[in-house]
A protein has these predicted regions:
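Transmembrane alpha-helices and adjacent helix-loop boundaries
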Residues: 1-203
Length: 203
């Protein structure tokens, strides 16, 4: 098979590749946005001075940062369905679908990492700025809202950007639960054509 024939095959499957790309981008985009929403209270709790406030978020973050995303994906997709109470619940129409299982898993996974990014950013806020806020008569809540969080967001933004890129790369594992994301589409096409160029083309 010549290179022209190989590229012709790729062009033939471009619509499917585009659809898979959209699924991947949608999945990653929703995961990092929803994950950020959940990460804010987790990060604030992790930055607390009280151990009993830090304990539960620490356990959550420890689990999701300490185990592979693929294992978490299998636990949600294959593990939860083993419980009859789940299969009879109103959540079952969603939990039996690979898309929602992938979205839930990726959201929980990335929220743990973003929470640690936020915790580090909060602790990196110069103490002088916090002291200045208190000297102006701001309460702890006001200082958090107007001084600490805005400053922490600016500090943590580069690391958050890196997390988005890492999640985009990690999303390749969702094809293992029959998701037709970009990797799932490529695997399907590859099983028909045996062309390895598709992997390089998408990369």
């Amino acid at each position: 098979m010549t290179w022209a024939e190989r590229w012709a095959t790729i062009e033939r499957f471009l619509p499917q590749l585009w659809d898979g790309t959209l699924v991947t981008l949608q999945l990653v985009g929703l995961a990092v946005l929803i994950g950020l929403f959940f990460a804010i209270p987790l990060g604030l709790a992790r930055a607390s001075r009280h151990w009993y406030i830090r304990a539960l978020p620490y356990s959550y973050i420890f689990f999701f940062r300490g185990t592979p995303l693929l294992l978490q994906l299998f636990l949600v997709y294959y593990g939860i369905s083993q419980f009859e109470v789940v299969r009879k619940s109103f959540l079952w129409p969603y939990l039996r679908e690979p898309y929602w299982c992938a979205l839930i898993t990726m959201t929980m996974h990335t929220s743990a990492y973003i929470a640690e990014i936020l915790r580090g950013a909060i602790q990196a806020v110069p103490p002088g700025e916090v002291e200045a806020a208190r000297a102006l008569g701001m309460s702890r809540r006001q200082a958090l809202q107007y001084i600490i969080l805005p400053r922490a967001i600016r500090i943590g933004l580069p690391a958050y950007g890196n997390e988005v890129i890492l999640m985009l790369k990690a999303s390749a594992v969702v094809y293992t639960i029959t998701m037709m994301d970009i990797m799932g589409v490529i695997r399907t096409i590859n099983s028909r054509t045996y062309q390895y160029e598709l992997f390089f083309f998408v990369a």
